[in-house]
């Protein structure tokens, strides 16, 4: 949510989705 540098990596879904979806393989992996 606060990491803009990480949310700028749209892998499968949009940045907004990645913040809420933990199943997505992308920025979420970095934060969790």
UniProtKB/Swiss-Prot annotation:
Glycosylation-annotated residues: 11
Superkingdom per UniProt: Eukaryota
Annotated ranges, domain Fibronectin type-II: 19-32
UniProt entry tagged with the keyword Disulfide bond: yes
GO cellular component term, pick one: extracellular region
BP terms from Gene Ontology: single fertilization
Family to which this protein belongs: Belongs to the seminal plasma protein family.
Quaternary structure (record): Homodimer.
Protein name: Seminal plasma protein PDC-109
Species for this entry: Bos indicus
Species lineage: Eukaryota, Metazoa, Chordata, Craniata, Vertebrata
């Amino acid at each position: 949510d606060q990491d803009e540098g990480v949310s700028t990596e749209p892998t499968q879904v949009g940045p907004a989705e990645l913040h809420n979806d933990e199943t997505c393989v992308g920025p979420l992996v970095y934060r969790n």
